[in-house]
UniProtKB/Swiss-Prot annotation:
The lineage of its organism: Eukaryota, Metazoa, Ecdysozoa, Arthropoda, Chelicerata. GO terms for cellular component: extracellular region. GO terms for molecular function: calcium channel regulator activity; toxin activity. Concentration-dependent partial inhibitor of Cav3.2/CACNA1H (IC(50)=1.18 uM) and Cav3.3/CACNA1I (IC(50)=0.49 uM) depolarized currents. In vivo, in a mouse model of post-surgical pain, it produces antiallodynia for both mechanical and thermal pain. Pro-4 adopts a trans conformation. Negative results: does not show activity on Cav3.1/CACNA1G, all Cav1.x and all Cav2.x calcium channels. This is Omega-buthitoxin-Hf1a. It is found in: Secreted. Expressed by the venom gland. The modification Tryptophan amide is found at residue 10.
Length: 10
């Protein structure tokens, strides 16, 4: 899942 808010994926 990725978060455009922090720009990271896990």
């Amino acid at each position: 899942h990725c978060t455009p808010n922090s720009n990271h994926c896990w």
